[in-house]
Amino acid sequence: MEPTYEEYLANHGTIVKPYYWLSFSLDCSNCPYHIRTGEEARVSLTEFCQIFGFPYGTTYPQTKHLTFYELKTSSGSLVQKGHASSCTGNYIHPESMLFEMNGYLDSAIYNNDSIRHIILYCNNSPCNEANHCCISKVYNFLITYPGITLSIYFSQLYHTEMDFPASAWNREALRSLASLWPRVVLSPISGGIWHSVLHSFVSGVSGSHVFQPILTGRALTDRYNAYEINAITGVKPFFTDVLLHTKRNPNTKAQMALESYPLNNAFPGQSFQMTSGIPPDLRAPVVFVLLPLRDLPPMHMGQDPNKPRNIIRHLNMPQMSFQETKDLERLPTRRSVETVEITERFASSKQAEEKTKKKKGKK
């Protein structure tokens, strides 16, 4: 294959021109080296916080796109890490650069058959708008390499709101990509994944600073992203939920903050009743119960045209608090149907008991 990129050795890794015709541009601060590997992939804490909306949650629309990636073997060993940044001068997204035919990842996997799993950590979910076609390129890449599995973690959804002109394309493309589960995982960054990204890709952060508790504002944004991607794709995300572990860490301030937060701001279109009239400090820490993050084994499988799009995955989730259970029952899930069925069974059993008592009384 004739690659479209050029790679150069740097002090702590490599720097890559994803398209060999790119040159230095005054319109883009990252041109022409939009892909960086190894320790060259690290960014400053300030840049990371601004682009990923960490640690307080996304507060404004993000125009810059930054994607960290890891290439791993089937056993989970790291082959390479790196990042790809968007080109503001040529308006190119990171996923488009990485998954381009004859591009960097295409060449990397073609020349190293031990790579079996790709993990992306994106500030924006991939799109499929006409000028980018990111998801289409990812989809074609997976068809070319049927032994590769892919996990995509994002800090915010990109152009999926109904009032955006191209949202229908993006939502439909996300559904198509999610239908490849379990080969493809779409999930928000949350919990311990934040700590992993900080440790691997952010410079100047080490020790206890990496494992600081996730703040309430960021945690609520992650939870909203999880429900939203589920509503779009019909596939429950593989994510770490926000749950307070009061037994091991009785942080009453964090608990009160989470339970009294006006959830109608975190879940647009839903009506929630506040337990307190004062909004909490979104900087209050939240204690997480982490679900184990495992690398999926390589799967040699094709797309089944008869496979339904709506896939429900059953995970053993940690026990939820009473307040969280009340809030989630208001969401449009199947819980209400199950509740009705259980109530009907209970009523039927109660009637049966009354009939038995009447029969005994007649005797």
From Swiss-Prot:
Question: Which InterPro entries does the annotation name?
Answer: APOBEC4, CMP_dCMP_dom
The keyword Metal-binding belongs to this UniProt entry's keyword annotation: yes
Annotated protein name in UniProt: Putative C->U-editing enzyme APOBEC-4
Q: Which residues bind Zn(2+)?
A: 93, 127, 134
Cofactor names:
Zn(2+)
Domain named CMP/dCMP-type deaminase: residues: 61-177
Class in the EC hierarchy, top level: hydrolase
Q: What GO MF annotations does this protein's record show?
A: hydrolase activity; metal ion binding
Q: Name one GO biological process term.
A: mRNA processing
Q: Which UniProt keywords apply?
A: Hydrolase, Metal-binding, mRNA processing, Zinc
* Gene coding for it: APOBEC4
For this protein, what is the EC number? Answer: 3.5.4.-
Whose protein is this, by species? Macaca fascicularis (Crab-eating macaque)
